[in-house]
């Protein structure tokens, strides 16, 4: 194996901890040309599609990549903003705000950056950049509160694959999940309360999570259970009775059975039942994206109203909500434990590095 190029080791180099915020990814533009490589990378991941590779290669390259890019591009065009893809815009803002929060609350400097599992900026690219900036300890913090092999695990795969090709490796920590973390639940509840204070409350709250194939649950993936726990804790925090909320799953792809009940079918049923107002929130999406802004806010609204519903509200994701940024910061700090020197000061750090360098040079080191 050929390892990545390394600069010559220099004694006394400033070192620090880092946090890498990882989200799923987005195409570079809302066009079929940009969607094709993005979808190819995403759908070629065996963590995402678990069927025999040879068969899937034929389906992907012979059918899907010749039809789906145009359809997906139309959906992305409906939500694209002047700043770009909403997912990328929100994730970048979250990283900047998290950096500011940690700058105020962490005992020592922390580098914060973000990466996408698919598309750019990629995980290997950003990890290399953080290492070059002096990070010798990096926490990989997924934007997915609920663990799933098809989201969380594949992000870790990419990080570990980069680590495997790196000669002078930084220490790497991963955060598996925070679906039941009190700070996360409080942020979700605060976000909903803020929305309801301005727009009133619904007859039914639909908590929609991204779906995964049913067989993943049967094979041991805890995702379904973690979604249910998040929903239960959020309902309790809001004081909701069982009849006041539903837990559903969206974004089904292909013909296989996915986790149920499906969000679209539930919205249609609520409309037929004559429910006056439905609010939809997506607790598993910490940043608004195609699945929330187009699939829920547009398609979901149309389905509910067409079935006889009267009023539909999509409650925005956590995005840059102040309580979410604080929650993200506290979650990060807890997982940086032992990596941040409580007694750190710039002067003490400089003195320690200079002493280390002078000792190394005295022993014959060149740098």
From Swiss-Prot:
Top-rank EC class of the record's enzyme: lyase
GO cellular component, one term: cytoplasm
Compartments it resides in: Cytoplasm
InterPro entries: Ferrochelatase, Ferrochelatase_AS, Ferrochelatase_C, Ferrochelatase_N
Highest taxon listed in the record's lineage: Bacteria
Keywords, in A-Z order: Cytoplasm, Heme biosynthesis, Iron, Lyase, Metal-binding, Porphyrin biosynthesis
Cross-referenced PANTHER family: FERROCHELATASE, FERROCHELATASE, MITOCHONDRIAL
Function: Catalyzes the ferrous insertion into protoporphyrin IX.
Designated name of the protein: Ferrochelatase
Organism field: Thiobacillus denitrificans (strain ATCC 25259 / T1)
